[in-house]
């Protein structure tokens, strides 16, 4: 049978020929659903269609949906690599009917595909139905000709699907394939159904009810939702019982074997499979805008990456491996998912950086793991407290600890680990549960369905006329907004830009006969409904009211300059740093711009200067900024940059600016729906303020343009001139003069520290005799005041040199009355006295607690510096005890 790519295509083509719309996979980060960590099923992008709050221009659809299950309820991570069918990343093939065909056509389409198109033997197929679904039972007999013995009624929830406690629901019918009696396992519904003989290949969900509190009603327009795992059906069609034996997975595993020189069918087979699976989820998540971090989706990605990297080390990889596998994945899957082609450089850089960091973590963590587990035998339990220490101190995830111990037959004490982790787990849940795109209020679905999209005029004009189509206040439609009221207005057309793509929404004024309102902000709902946040200042705003619309021109002009500048900076960053640079977010406001991009380390001063110079070169050329509409595939194919994870329509706006000196092509070409200047010279000037880190592998550039940049530069110039006047030098000499002053200050501080040290050594400071003997041990006690805390250790070291053998204690009283204490023990007495124990005795007298350091040098402090002498005396008593 054909390869995985051909099987995917044949599924989609079959349903297209049968009247279905081919819909692209949605991103792995769900849209409009803050409760879901990752897209984990084909129906996720159609959730609002099934519930009736969203309408699509088609009633039948077919998709190949990329999915991840590695966190929360749907978590396959721990099993991946050790079974034939578990994955973190998988593709879900599905056909959908939104109130169109129902059970009879769904069963007919499914049966014809698998038996006629794919030629699966009919006598190896069986179906399950919900126990009271007589209609589906009879259809399987009629359409497929299945005998009663191969139609199984299932009474459990396995064959009844519900979206939640309320909403659409209905019975399921699953198609199973019988691999033969040479494989253990029984049919579905039997005691040994979990065996590998009977494998589910397709699930058909018949959404025919609506669950309400206390009752279940028939839906007026029943729907169909189906799901078939591409990996599972590909294995079957390619004659194997193992998903990892398909051509796609074999290609990745073969590359792992080539790079590690470890056979993929030997004792370390599981490691090859973990790496192959986790490579897919890692690259696809990065392509959809997720980067490794310590919270939310980024933390799940980091766990996936690091689990794969741990197995790379088990295969003997001495250098980072994962990034070297990206090309084979792009070669195998890039045609079906062009986003991973665009993200190849970023994914490669991210994997290399993460594996480099993790190898340092592994070295520290594995050392402790081996030390703590050295005496354990098979069947023993590894202390949960130590597992938590590995996690908390060394960044060593629990699943890696369990993975490392599994081969030796050792389990982790999960109870103790879970108790220690309770707080962190609660925080992690809070971090991601609301981290998705905010859910859209239901009211806007109704407005969108009734009024359609808002016509946006703002690319060509900042003034227009429009009519009120809807008014919304506190989540509900209203008929009017009186003077003093605040609410949302939807117009038939508008010049006001709605907040999107990082660009802030427009503000301005709307007015009509007897009515005026300030537009405070403009947003976009459902992609194309422009919503104006207004405060009525005169009269009453009503449905149908004709209005004159005027954008705040000065504010829009400043926003345009900043948005165009982000495009120039984006391309300049790529020219200076490399092709791995990709936009990760932005803020385009009237007073500033902020641009987040992928890069593993801070920019040097020279790199920042180069980026700024390149951007200003194109500003000074004052070249035209061109925009045109193109088909999205043509735009991307032409080289226009797209934002990873962004959802584009069939037609997109392409913004080009500048001319590359080398080849005459446009300097910057991006897909962008924002507003821009007419010529690059309208930006005025670009001034980069700062580069900072916002997450692992993500940097942030902040900059100003036009008037804001000029004011900033003027302020900086004024400050420089004022400083020059204070120093009595020219502005050109300020840097050298300040450097000289800083060095002079450092020298004075060093001289002062040396003077204090000599004073302390000279006569024991304020405490009288410097050295005494306590039970044969020399004890040097020094009480001083006003010393820099960082000088105390130097004084102790000097004291240890002076006495040769013994104990030195220095107590300092600061200007605020607090006390600091440092205790040192010479090397020859290391086995007799512990500086940490001695310092704790003195710190307690100062009113403090604890103290830290090493057995030969420790420090601590307390609020009562007046008791410095008493603290030194307490240490003396301890030496004599």
Swiss-Prot record:
Alphabetized, the UniProt keywords read: Aminoacyl-tRNA synthetase, ATP-binding, Cytoplasm, Ligase, Metal-binding, Nucleotide-binding, Protein biosynthesis, RNA-binding, tRNA-binding, Zinc
Q: What is its EC number?
A: 6.1.1.7
Tell me which Pfam families the record gives: DHHA1, tRNA-synt_2c, tRNA_SAD
Please list the GO biological process terms of this entry. Answer: alanyl-tRNA aminoacylation; negative regulation of DNA-templated transcription
GO MF annotations in UniProt: alanine-tRNA ligase activity; aminoacyl-tRNA deacylase activity; ATP binding; tRNA binding; zinc ion binding
* One Gene Ontology cellular component annotation held by this UniProt entry: cytosol
Q: Where in the cell is it found?
A: Cytoplasm
List the disulfide bonds in this chain: none
SMART domains, alphabetically?
tRNA_SAD
Cofactors named for this entry: Zn(2+)
Q: Which superkingdom heads the taxonomic lineage of this protein's source?
A: Bacteria
Primary localisation category:
cytoplasm
Catalyzes what?
Answer: tRNA(Ala) + L-alanine + ATP = L-alanyl-tRNA(Ala) + AMP + diphosphate
| HAMAP family the UniProt entry points to | Ala_tRNA_synth_B
Its annotated function is as follows: Catalyzes the attachment of alanine to tRNA(Ala) in a two-step reaction: alanine is first activated by ATP to form Ala-AMP and then transferred to the acceptor end of tRNA(Ala). Also edits incorrectly charged Ser-tRNA(Ala) and Gly-tRNA(Ala) via its editing domain.
Please give the record's comment on domains.
Consists of three domains; the N-terminal catalytic domain, the editing domain and the C-terminal C-Ala domain. The editing domain removes incorrectly charged amino acids, while the C-Ala domain, along with tRNA(Ala), serves as a bridge to cooperatively bring together the editing and aminoacylation centers thus stimulating deacylation of misacylated tRNAs.
Q: Which family does it belong to?
A: Belongs to the class-II aminoacyl-tRNA synthetase family.
**Name listed for the protein in its UniProt record:** Alanine--tRNA ligase
Q: Which gene encodes it?
A: alaS
């Amino acid at each position: 049978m054909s390869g995985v790519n051909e099987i995917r295509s044949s599924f989609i083509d079959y349903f297209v020929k049968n009247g279905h719309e081919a819909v692209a996979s949605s991103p792995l980060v769900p849209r409009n659903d803050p409760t879901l960590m990752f897209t984990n099923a084909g129906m996720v992008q159609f959730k609002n269609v099934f519930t009736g709050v969203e309408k699509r221009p088609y009633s039948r659809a077919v998709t190949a949906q990329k999915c991840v299950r590695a966190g929360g309820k749907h978590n396959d991570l721990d099993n991946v690599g050790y079974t034939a069918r578990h994955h973190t990343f998988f593709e879900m093939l599905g056909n959908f009917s939104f109130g169109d065909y129902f059970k009879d056509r769904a069963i007919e389409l499914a049966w014809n595909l698998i038996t006629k198109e794919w030629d699966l033997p009919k006598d190896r197929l069986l179906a399950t139905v919900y126990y009271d679904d007589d209609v589906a039972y009879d259809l399987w007999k009629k359409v497929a000709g299945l005998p009663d013995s191969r139609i199984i009624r299932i009474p459990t929830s396995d064959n009844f699907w519900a979206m939640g406690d309320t909403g659409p629901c209905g019975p399921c019918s699953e198609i199973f394939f019988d691999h033969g009696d040479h494989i253990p396992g029984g049919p579905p519904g039997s005691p040994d159904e979990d065996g590998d003989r009977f494998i589910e290949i397709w699930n058909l969900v018949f959404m025919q009810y609506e669950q309400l509190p206390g009752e279940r009603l028939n839906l007026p327009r029943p729907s169909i939702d189906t799901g078939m795992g591409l990996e599972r059906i590909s294995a079957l069609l390619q004659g194997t019982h193992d998903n990892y034996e398909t051509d796609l997975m074999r290609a990745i595993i073969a590359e792992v074997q080539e790079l590690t020189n470890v056979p993929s069918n030997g004792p370390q087979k599981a490691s090859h499979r973990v790496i192959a699976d986790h490579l897919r989820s890692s690259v696809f998540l990065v392509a959809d805008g997720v980067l490794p971090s310590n919270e939310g989706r980024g933390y799940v990605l980091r766990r996936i990456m690091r689990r794969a990297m741990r197995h790379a080390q088990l295969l003997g990889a001495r250098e980072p491996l994962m990034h070297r596998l990206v090309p084979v994945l792009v070669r195998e899957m890039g045609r079906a998912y062009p986003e991973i082609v665009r993200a190849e450089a970023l994914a490669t850089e991210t994997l290399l950086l993460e594996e480099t960091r993790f190898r340092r973590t592994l070295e520290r963590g594995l050392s402790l793991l081996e030390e703590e587990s050295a005496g354990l035998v098979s069947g023993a339990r590894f202390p949960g407290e130590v597992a938590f220490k590995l996690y908390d101190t060394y960044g060593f995830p629990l699943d890696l600890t369990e993975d490392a111990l599994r081969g030796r037959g050792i389990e982790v004490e999960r109870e103790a680990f879970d108790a220690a982790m309770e707080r962190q787990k609660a925080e992690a849940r809070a971090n991601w549960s609301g981290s998705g795109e905010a859910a859209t209020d239901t009211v806007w679905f109704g407005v969108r369905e009734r009024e359609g999209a808002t016509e946006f005029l703002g690319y060509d004009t900042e003034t227009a006329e429009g009519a009120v189509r809807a008014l919304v206040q506190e989540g509900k439609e209203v008929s009017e907004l009186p003077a003093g009221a605040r609410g949302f207005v939807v117009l038939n057309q508008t010049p006001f830009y709605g907040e999107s793509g990082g660009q802030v929404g427009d503000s301005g004024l709307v007015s009509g006969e007897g009515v005026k309102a300030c537009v405070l902000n403009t947003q976009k709902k459902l992609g194309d409904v422009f919503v104006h946040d207004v405060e009525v200042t005169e009269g009453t705003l009503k449905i149908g009211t004709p209005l004159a619309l005027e954008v705040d021109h000065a504010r829009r002009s400043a926003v345009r300059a900043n948005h165009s500048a982000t495009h120039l900076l984006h391309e300049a960053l790529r020219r200076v740093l490399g092709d791995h640079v990709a936009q990760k977010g932005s803020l385009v406001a009237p007073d500033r711009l902020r641009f987040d991009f992928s890069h593993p380390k801070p920019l040097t001063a020279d790199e920042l200067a180069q980026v700024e110079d390149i951007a200003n070169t194109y500003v000074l050329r004052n070249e035209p900024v061109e925009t045109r509409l193109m088909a999205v595939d043509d735009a991307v194919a032409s080289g226009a940059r797209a934002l990873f994870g962004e959802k584009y329509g069939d037609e997109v706006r392409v913004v080009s600016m500048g001319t590359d000196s080398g080849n005459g092509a446009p300097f910057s070409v991006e897909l962008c729906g924002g507003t821009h200047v007419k010529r690059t010279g309208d930006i005025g000037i670009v001034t980069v303020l700062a580069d900072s880190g916002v997450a692992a592998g993500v940097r942030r550039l902040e900059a100003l343009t036009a008037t804001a940049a000029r004011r900033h530069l003027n302020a900086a110039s004024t400050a420089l001139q004022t400083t020059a006047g204070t120093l009595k030098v020219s502005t050109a000499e300020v840097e050298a003069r300040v450097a000289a002053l800083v060095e002079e200050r450092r020298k004075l501080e060093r001289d002062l520290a040396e003077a204090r040290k000599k004073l302390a050594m000279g006569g024991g400071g304020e405490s009288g005799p410097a050295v005494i003997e306590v039970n044969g041990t020399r004890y040097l006690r020094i009480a001083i005041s006003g010393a820099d805390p960082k000088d105390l250790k130097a004084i102790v070291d000097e004291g240890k040199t002076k006495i040769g053998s013994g104990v030195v204690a220095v107590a300092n009283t600061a200007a605020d009355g607090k006390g600091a204490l440092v205790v040192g023990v010479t090397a020859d007495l290391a086995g007799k006295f512990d500086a940490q124990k001695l310092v704790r005795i003195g710190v307690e007298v100062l009113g403090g607690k604890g103290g830290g350091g090493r057995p030969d040098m420790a420090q601590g402090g307390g609020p009562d510096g007046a008791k410095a002498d008493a603290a030194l005396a307490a240490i003396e008593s301890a030496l004599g005890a």
